Amino acid sequence: MIEDNKENKDHSLERGRASLIFSLKNEVGGLIKALKIFQEKHVNLLHIESRKSKRRNSEFEIFVDCDINREQLNDIFHLLKSHTNVLSVNLPDNFTLKEDGMETVPWFPKKISDLDHCANRVLMYGSELDADHPGFKDNVYRKRRKYFADLAMNYKHGDPIPKVEFTEEEIKTWGTVFQELNKLYPTHACREYLKNLPLLSKYCGYREDNIPQLEDVSNFLKERTGFSIRPVAGYLSPRDFLSGLAFRVFHCTQYVRHSSDPFYTPEPDTCHELLGHVPLLAEPSFAQFSQEIGLASLGASEEAVQKLATCYFFTVEFGLCKQDGQLRVFGAGLLSSISELKHALSGHAKVKPFDPKITCKQECLITTFQDVYFVSESFEDAKEKMREFTKTIKRPFGVKYNPYTRSIQILKDTKSITSAMNELQHDLDVVSDALAKVSRKPSI
């Protein structure tokens, strides 16, 4: 045993030359914090370069070449993952990164508080708007956007979501969207949506003259399906967004689209989140469908995550379903867009049956109508098809969500799988006992 430990220690101290590329926001002190991680782990840096990110104008990419041992590299890799976006790691031939005894997999949150490490990796921050954004030249709007972004960036798991006093202009914009969409919902939205929307009006203040507070909405969802809301400053990467769903956490923007064009937004805003997503997150079957996509993404390859994100896009965002022999909408992108909601059920839109193997290859369009929409027989049908599809995703482990600790159980060996089976057996015993009692009950 001692010899084994010595061998493992020697193995972990093998040295080599490795290079890493990670991205940082262009802010004072960002690089110093990242390099301090190398210093604290006593890693010798051989070369450092910086360049402006080709993907995001507000970020810089840092290239680091270093002399490092296996143990140091594992530590630094996971510390950097918590503070930066690690783009690539070039390892010596004799190195492999390991985590909990597994071959290298992309970092993913193991407990709900770990979302603090990835919820702020937004693609745009605050007042950083593209030139074609309706609010690009509006300094007052940009300042307001930064206010909402700062609220989200300062949020930590367990905090109450700050209450916001919305401006008259924001409420008017919300009201315009709310009024027009509610004219279409009875003939376009699925029955589950129509069932939950009145409950949100009753318990969360969904009204034309009132923008609901995220804290109230989050508390409502917790009681209905166990989902909660977490404020976010803007777009997240597919991996970071889907990882939240694994914990039944929905990352939700709080800002309102620009008033100059209330029927268009190039990005998700609170109208999209609250009117498009929330009513169906209050539906148990749909909530389960969303969480299972999130769980499938944990530790998956970039290619697999992209496929899952595309399936999410064409179901949760732009999905159609059949009800009473007619097409109905359950996708949030459609339920929050007056023009595309009309178009999707106009009879002129191209519609195909939902098949994840085909859907995952379809191009996602952001600023125009989709070229095609996918229709599911039901949420259960979509869920079963996604379950079969996720079996094709290669991971050296399985995952199971523990709702009591709000953490992820990694099923990677006999011990962890046996533990999960014992929990399942207990649940089956409870159900079997209940069935036995019901069957013995005399009929009236």
Curated annotation (Swiss-Prot):
<dbReference type="GO" id="GO:0009072">
    <property type="term" value="P:aromatic amino acid metabolic process"/>
</dbReference>
<dbReference type="GO" id="GO:0042427">
    <property type="term" value="P:serotonin biosynthetic process"/>
</dbReference>
<comment type="function">
    <text>Oxidizes L-tryptophan to 5-hydroxy-l-tryptophan in the rate-determining step of serotonin biosynthesis.</text>
</comment>
<feature type="binding site">
    <location>
        <position position="257"/>
    </location>
    <ligand>
        <name>L-tryptophan</name>
    </ligand>
</feature>
<feature type="binding site">
    <location>
        <position position="265"/>
    </location>
    <ligand>
        <name>L-tryptophan</name>
    </ligand>
</feature>
<dbReference type="GO" id="GO:0005506">
    <property type="term" value="F:iron ion binding"/>
</dbReference>
<keyword id="KW-0560">Oxidoreductase</keyword>
<keyword id="KW-0503">Monooxygenase</keyword>
<comment type="pathway">
    <text>Aromatic compound metabolism; serotonin biosynthesis; serotonin from L-tryptophan: step 1/2.</text>
</comment>
<dbReference type="Pfam" id="PF00351">
    <property type="entry name" value="Biopterin_H"/>
</dbReference>
<protein>
    <recommendedName>
        <fullName>Tryptophan 5-hydroxylase 1</fullName>
        <ecNumber>1.14.16.4</ecNumber>
    </recommendedName>
</protein>
<dbReference type="InterPro" id="IPR036329">
    <property type="entry name" value="Aro-AA_hydroxylase_C_sf"/>
</dbReference>
<dbReference type="GO" id="GO:0045600">
    <property type="term" value="P:positive regulation of fat cell differentiation"/>
</dbReference>
<keyword id="KW-0597">Phosphoprotein</keyword>
<dbReference type="GO" id="GO:0060749">
    <property type="term" value="P:mammary gland alveolus development"/>
</dbReference>
<feature type="binding site">
    <location>
        <position position="336"/>
    </location>
    <ligand>
        <name>L-tryptophan</name>
    </ligand>
</feature>
<dbReference type="GO" id="GO:0046849">
    <property type="term" value="P:bone remodeling"/>
</dbReference>
<dbReference type="GO" id="GO:1900046">
    <property type="term" value="P:regulation of hemostasis"/>
</dbReference>
<keyword id="KW-0724">Serotonin biosynthesis</keyword>
<keyword id="KW-0408">Iron</keyword>
<dbReference type="InterPro" id="IPR001273">
    <property type="entry name" value="ArAA_hydroxylase"/>
</dbReference>
<dbReference type="InterPro" id="IPR018301">
    <property type="entry name" value="ArAA_hydroxylase_Fe/CU_BS"/>
</dbReference>
<comment type="similarity">
    <text>Belongs to the biopterin-dependent aromatic amino acid hydroxylase family.</text>
</comment>
<dbReference type="InterPro" id="IPR019773">
    <property type="entry name" value="Tyrosine_3-monooxygenase-like"/>
</dbReference>
<feature type="binding site">
    <location>
        <position position="317"/>
    </location>
    <ligand>
        <name>Fe cation</name>
    </ligand>
</feature>
<dbReference type="InterPro" id="IPR045865">
    <property type="entry name" value="ACT-like_dom_sf"/>
</dbReference>
<feature type="binding site">
    <location>
        <position position="235"/>
    </location>
    <ligand>
        <name>L-tryptophan</name>
    </ligand>
</feature>
<keyword id="KW-0832">Ubl conjugation</keyword>
<dbReference type="InterPro" id="IPR005963">
    <property type="entry name" value="Trp_5_mOase"/>
</dbReference>
<dbReference type="GO" id="GO:0004510">
    <property type="term" value="F:tryptophan 5-monooxygenase activity"/>
</dbReference>
<dbReference type="GO" id="GO:0002576">
    <property type="term" value="P:platelet degranulation"/>
</dbReference>
<feature type="binding site">
    <location>
        <position position="277"/>
    </location>
    <ligand>
        <name>Fe cation</name>
    </ligand>
</feature>
<keyword id="KW-0479">Metal-binding</keyword>
<dbReference type="InterPro" id="IPR041904">
    <property type="entry name" value="TrpOH_cat"/>
</dbReference>
<dbReference type="InterPro" id="IPR019774">
    <property type="entry name" value="Aromatic-AA_hydroxylase_C"/>
</dbReference>
<feature type="binding site">
    <location>
        <position position="366"/>
    </location>
    <ligand>
        <name>L-tryptophan</name>
    </ligand>
</feature>
<feature type="domain" description="ACT">
    <location>
        <begin position="19"/>
        <end position="94"/>
    </location>
</feature>
<dbReference type="InterPro" id="IPR002912">
    <property type="entry name" value="ACT_dom"/>
</dbReference>
<feature type="modified residue" description="Phosphoserine; by PKA">
    <location>
        <position position="58"/>
    </location>
</feature>
<dbReference type="InterPro" id="IPR036951">
    <property type="entry name" value="ArAA_hydroxylase_sf"/>
</dbReference>
<dbReference type="GO" id="GO:0043005">
    <property type="term" value="C:neuron projection"/>
</dbReference>
<dbReference type="GO" id="GO:0005829">
    <property type="term" value="C:cytosol"/>
</dbReference>
